[in-house]
From Swiss-Prot:
InterPro entries: F-box-assoc_dom_typ3, F-box-assoc_interact_dom, F-box-like_dom_sf, F-box_dom. Disulfide bonds: none annotated. This is Putative F-box protein At1g33020. Pfam families: F-box, FBA_3. It comes from the Eukaryota. Residues 380-404 are annotated as: Disordered. Residues 382-392 have a biased composition (Pro residues). Residues 4-53 form the F-box domain.
Amino acid sequence: MNRAENLDSIPTDLILEIFSRMSTKSIGRCRCVSKLWKSMLGHPYFTELFLTRSSDHPRLLFGVKRERQWLFFSSPQPQDLYEKSSLVDFHMNFSDFHMNFSGDIRRNECTYVSGFIYFPRKRIKNYLCDFRVICNPITGQYAILQLITFHEKRSFLGFDPIDKQFKVLRMKYNDRGIVVHHILTLEPGKMRWRKIRCPLAHEPFWEEICANGVLYYLAEPTDGGSYVICCFDVRSEKFKFIDAKCFGDFSIQLINYKGKLGGISWKYDTVDGKRTVELYMWVLEDVEKQKWSKYVYPLPGNSYHYSVAGVTAKGDIVFVKTYTSKPFYVFYVNPEKKTFQRVEIHGNHEVFDTNNLVYAFVDHVEDLQFDVMKKTYAAKPISPPKQKPKPPSTETSSREDHQGWISISSRKYHQVRTIAHRQQGRRKFESINKFNALYLDDGDEDTVAHQQRDHHTFKSISKFKAQRLLDDDEFTGVKTSKCDTSHLQNRVTAVHELHIWSITVGKVSLASQVSIKPEADTDAILDKVIEYIKRHHVTIQVEKEQNP
């Protein structure tokens, strides 16, 4: 009996059981071995099996911000904290470095939902505009959902555990300055924003949490009433509201306390020259009657150097140090058992040698769903076309693998596309662009989406009128440093419309479509387009083709 026969004799269920005990990174590598393994490890049955297995071993997820980068780590969440004394040091190790996420990400605009990180407003490297981004911090995969429109106020990501669907709730101002609500379901095929009705006009705050299929966030009614907690049922897409005046003037962080909605805040004071810290916690005991329980716990005086990561399923409030250090500690406080535990986390990464911003999420479960989303929603990377033999090249790239082209018709319609290939060293399974193009509602005039004809991919097109773009010193809509603007007058008369097509991060792909007025100097305008792309993106090879 040869090896192939030995492998065939192993039951498939046993093979999947073995794979389910592996790490997410190892599974990603195994998917690259063969088409059979890719199909087997991407099957919904295995995805659910892996999630069930991971749920038995929740982890702490750490995000560390270093300059303009976010690095994600995870560590096993201790399960036997209370088998020893009330104050014990535990020593745990970080898992391998998972993700290096470039871009400008602000702390209060990064949320955690069912194993995924959502950035409602993220500045992508090399782009001076904001995007929505969802990522799996363990596999390093992420998807750019859409450009952010100018009038948008806030957006939240929610998860429906019954239908296993992610939805984005967006709030934006209409032409009358009133906040309107839209919902986007992340699913295969055509996706579009749907306008939904909210019975209470309100201004959303940053604090939010998604628990048991309900998205909670703090808000202030526009009529000037007391603060409320908006409860958005992700599945039914209906709103309910809870009075939040019990919080008073406290700055509240919403939490999931053993399946109940809760809020946490701090109070600092100085007594006899000593700094005191008190932890205030509210728990919603009765949703219908809106009955809250309030708890106050004294904490060590140096607790102001820590932040609340969340509450574990066992009721432990988790505190993490605000900045990286060696040693690095995590504290577990259990109000019911009146215990205070300290866990030392060992991280050998260089990021812990300096002070970098840290925040953490509790009960993190490694999930492969994003890989399945990749399989369902992924767009194949745009690749350069085959070179035509006749058209002459007017500019030559310093690198042969970067190509671009311009095609000129009798209507003076021009297209410029640049391709930047994947960075060397990235693993094959760390791909991006997981969703089909977003089709927007009629109220979104800033963005239009079209299906690419010659590829099974998509192009997300942001369409702007030239005058709007030229207000910011750059005909491409990108702000630049203040300088002599006399040259802009020619651009105003020359460029009629500019379409920016932008999809990728990692594999950067930019395509611009420019309509030029007949009286304009075609070559001069095209040279400016090429100059801009070369300056801000990649070196390209350009071909001009004149149609008869």
